[in-house]
């Protein structure tokens, strides 16, 4: 994954080394950090991050783009999804189909979305499995580090998904407080 949107090493969490800690400990810690910010502050930070994503040269040339429908505590992707869709890009979003599986579906507008049992807006429609056609993938996570390690929410959806899109350019996004020197792998 690429982390050119990551914070400078002076961010508060940068020097923290979680290699000796467990993944659940780090997830709890990140959740506590997120609670220190208001919804407005996270929205403001999201806009700054998404502006950088929009300017990314790999995104500009991509035709088929994997994004995620953000939850309230994640970098907000809703405007990005709409903008790229309006630009004529083919947008793919994840749909959780079981406790261990997610699949991709084509975004066809917000009216063709429904709220999942996890409270996430997901596209309706047919399963998409042409992974080789994906040019660009925006990857969320609970924490990342300088060695390109990612910590998710603990279900393994992206651990299983990322190897399927080996050709795609992958860009991880997170708030600065989610980026660490080292995280458990």
Task: Label the model's feature ranges.
Residues 2-21, 25, 32-36, 132-137, ...:
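Surface-exposed, charge/polar-rich loops and edge strands
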Residues 78-82, 158-163:
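Short amphipathic alpha-helical segments and helix-helix/interface helices
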Residues 2-132:
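N-terminal active-site beta-alpha-beta segment that forms phosphate/nucleotide-binding
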Residues 74, 145-146:
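Short glycine-rich, flexible loops that bind phosphorylated cofactors or substrates
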Residues 121-123, 140-143:
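A structured binding-face within diverse protein domains that lines the active/interaction site
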Residues 67, 139-140:
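Redox-cofactor binding/interface segments in oxidoreductases and associated redox assembly factors
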Residues 60, 149-150:
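Alpha-helical protein-protein interaction elements
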């Amino acid at each position: 994954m690429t982390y050119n949107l990551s914070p400078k090493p002076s961010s508060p969490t940068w020097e923290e080394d979680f290699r000796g800690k467990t993944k659940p400990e780090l997830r709890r810690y990140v959740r506590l950090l997120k609670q220190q910010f208001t919804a407005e502050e996270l929205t403001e930070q999201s806009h700054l991050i998404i502006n950088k994503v929009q300017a990314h040269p790999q995104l500009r040339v991509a035709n088929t783009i994997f994004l995620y429908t953000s939850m309230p505590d994640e970098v907000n992707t809703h405007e990005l999804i709409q903008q790229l869709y309006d630009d004529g890009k083919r947008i793919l979003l994840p749909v959780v189909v079981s406790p261990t599986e997610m699949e991709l579906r084509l975004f066809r507008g917000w009216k063709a979305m429904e709220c999942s049992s996890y409270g996430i807006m997901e596209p309706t429609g047919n399963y998409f499995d042409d992974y080789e056609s994906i040019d660009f993938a925006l990857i969320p996570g609970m924490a990342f580090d300088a060695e390109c390690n990612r910590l998710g929410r603990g279900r393994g959806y992206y651990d299983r998904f990322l190897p399927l899109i080996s050709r795609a350019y992958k860009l991880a996004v997170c708030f600065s407080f989610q980026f660490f020197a080292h995280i458990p792998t």
